[in-house]
Amino acid sequence: DRRQELSNENVLVKVSRRQLEELSKNAKSSSRRSVSSESGPFNLRSEDPLYSNNSGKFFELTPEKNQQLQDLDLFVNSVDLKEGSLLLPNYNSRALLVLVLVVNEGKGDFELVGQRNENQGKEN
């Protein structure tokens, strides 16, 4: 049954912090578009927030603004919310992978929200 095949394609898997650390030790960009690329951490909050109001601040770094993100074809967002504020999810339908880092009381957890096959959604 085709529906059964499709439902088995995008399985969410919980990954432990130790597994993430192990994977990130040797992580490199697979892109060959750029010969030189800065490496190392960057401070997302060193720029002005894209949006800011009484409820908090929304920071975004795009591939156009950061060479490392160009190599990975990646967008990075960060939100500082004040207590009692609410952020509704923003979903990019072209994203191949949506990964969320949830920080609660100083402890961070990665959550894989969705994954899409590159060919999914393309017209034949």
UniProtKB/Swiss-Prot annotation:
Q: Which residues are glycosylated?
A: 53
Disordered: annotated span: 23-57
| UniProt cross-references to InterPro entries, sorted A to Z | Cupin_1, RmlC_Cupin_sf, Seed_Storage-Functional
Gene3D superfamilies, A to Z: 2.60.120.1450
Sorted alphabetically, which SUPFAM superfamilies does this protein's record hold?
RmlC-like cupins
Q: Which domain of life is it from?
A: Eukaryota
GO cellular-component term (any): aleurone grain
- Alphabetical UniProt keywords: Glycoprotein, Seed storage protein, Storage protein, Vacuole
User: Could you confirm whether the keyword Glycoprotein appears in this record?
Assistant: yes
Location(s) in or outside the cell: Vacuole, Aleurone grain; Vacuole
A Pfam family it matches:
Cupin_1
An annotated Gene Ontology molecular function: nutrient reservoir activity
Tell me its family. Belongs to the 7S seed storage protein family.
Instruction: Add the further remark from the entry.
Output: The microsequencing technique did not distinguish Leu from Ile; however, residues at positions 6, 23, 44, 86, 87, 97, and 112 are most likely to be Leu as these are points of chymotryptic cleavage.
This protein is called Vicilin, 14 kDa component
